[in-house]
Amino acid sequence: MVMTDPIADFLTRIRNANQVKHEVLEVPASNIKKGIAEILKREGFVKNVEVIEDDKQGIIRVFLKYGKNGERVITNLKRISKPGLRVYAKRDDMPKVLNGLGIAIISTSEGLLTDKEARQKNVGGEVVAYVW
């Protein structure tokens, strides 16, 4: 079966694993999923990310992060730009998620960046997702 939106599938798998408090999540690898996972790690939303190479496309192993009392670090993830409706932001109109408490993941000419990094580099791009 052909998947029309692998990014939405990736975000949904993270959301579902987070809801039931799984420690580890494995998803089929792709370059954009690797980029999103690395941003989540860099911003402190997940503990660690491993890329496991195999004979096929590879697997991304995401280690989810929880607080001391088991509270979720990722409250929600939302896909913004979809295959049927692409959403772009100019460098001056970069979105802020919950007044800076969350992040927007932006696909730019310089690769995947957070909204803050895109503002610093003065670039716009496609708004992939919001994470808070």
UniProtKB/Swiss-Prot annotation:
Gene Ontology molecular function terms on file: rRNA binding; structural constituent of ribosome
The organism's place on the tree of life at top rank: Bacteria
Keywords (A to Z) from UniProt: Ribonucleoprotein, Ribosomal protein, RNA-binding, rRNA-binding
GO cellular component, one term: ribosome
Cross-referenced InterPro entries: Ribosomal_uS8 (IPR000630), Ribosomal_uS8_CS (IPR047863), Ribosomal_uS8_sf (IPR035987)
UniProt-listed GO biological process terms: translation
PROSITE patterns referenced in this protein's UniProt entry, alphabetically: RIBOSOMAL_S8
Assembly with partners or alone: Part of the 30S ribosomal subunit. Contacts proteins S5 and S12.
Protein family membership: Belongs to the universal ribosomal protein uS8 family.
NCBIfam families (alphabetical): PRK00136.1 (NF001109)
The protein's role, per its UniProt record: One of the primary rRNA binding proteins, it binds directly to 16S rRNA central domain where it helps coordinate assembly of the platform of the 30S subunit.
Protein name: Small ribosomal subunit protein uS8
Organism: Streptococcus pyogenes serotype M49 (strain NZ131)
